Amino acid sequence: MSSKSQLTYTARASKHPNALAKRLFEIAEAKKTNVTVSADVTTTKELLDLADRLGPYIAVIKTHIDILSDFSDETIEGLKALAQKHIFLIFEDRKFIDIGNTVQKQYHRGTLRISEWAHIINCSILPGEGIVEALAQTASAPDFGYGPERGLLILAEMTSKGSLATGQYTTSSVDYARKSKNFVMGFVSTRPLGEVQSEVSSPSDEEDFVVFTTGVNISSKGDKLGQQYQTPASAIGRGADFIIAGRGIYAAPDPVQAAQQYQKEGWEAYLARVGGN
């Protein structure tokens, strides 16, 4: 496990080279939560209701904004207001995967206006290094307007059965991240990837990529579509900094109670991991 994962969020925030990652760790420490809720609902009312009810217990809300049947200005302004009210970040799980010119327009232009409201986005590197370069270029442009308030996670691994995000794909994800550290804040992965070495890159002392792990569910081991779940304790134990839980929270009989349970288990696992550090 990367040595950075043994440090507290406060310690990592104090020295983190990425401004958004620094803010995220500060939020996690202040609220005592490492939970990201995946709010896979289909209407603006459901999304904003969940964000408001669960906001006090989460560090991040993850959206799939293109599944909303009624996306509008109300969606954007509502999410932004609730993120400010409850102090959480917004992660749009868009999984950009196209040529650079196209993803730039998808991110900063177009109907969904993602750059306007999503602090965090993610991408697959299947198109090659150009996708990371293109998104980083957009975020650093003089007219972008959001600067250090935006960051990218590279989809380096997946928790679904038979995932092809392994081996050289994962290694290349780390290579590309190291070239764009100001914008790439970390990975969606099942473990820390900071110690990955390749022919073109190697770890540096100041490197501290944030790990988001999907497929966290307290009461289920999987579904019929290939998803494989793990518990908050097992995910944090393997090196996750932030756990992503979806149906285990939003589809629970009492989503607020479920969010509190994930918060408790995730935080206890984090404290056990960092020990006396």
Swiss-Prot record:
Keywords: Decarboxylase, Lyase, Pyrimidine biosynthesis
Top EC category: lyase
Reaction it catalyzes: orotidine 5'-phosphate + H(+) = UMP + CO2
Pfam families: OMPdecase
Pathway where it operates: Pyrimidine metabolism; UMP biosynthesis via de novo pathway; UMP from orotate: step 2/2
A Gene Ontology molecular function term of the record: orotate phosphoribosyltransferase activity
Active site as annotated: 95
Superkingdom in the source lineage: Eukaryota
Binding locations of substrate: 40, 62-64, 93-102, 229, 247
Enzyme Commission number: 4.1.1.23
Disulfide-bond pairs as recorded: none
This protein's record includes keyword Lipoprotein: no
GO biological process: 'de novo' pyrimidine nucleobase biosynthetic process; 'de novo' UMP biosynthetic process
UniProt similarity note: Belongs to the OMP decarboxylase family.
Name used for this protein in its record: Orotidine 5'-phosphate decarboxylase
Protein species of origin: Aspergillus kawachii (White koji mold)
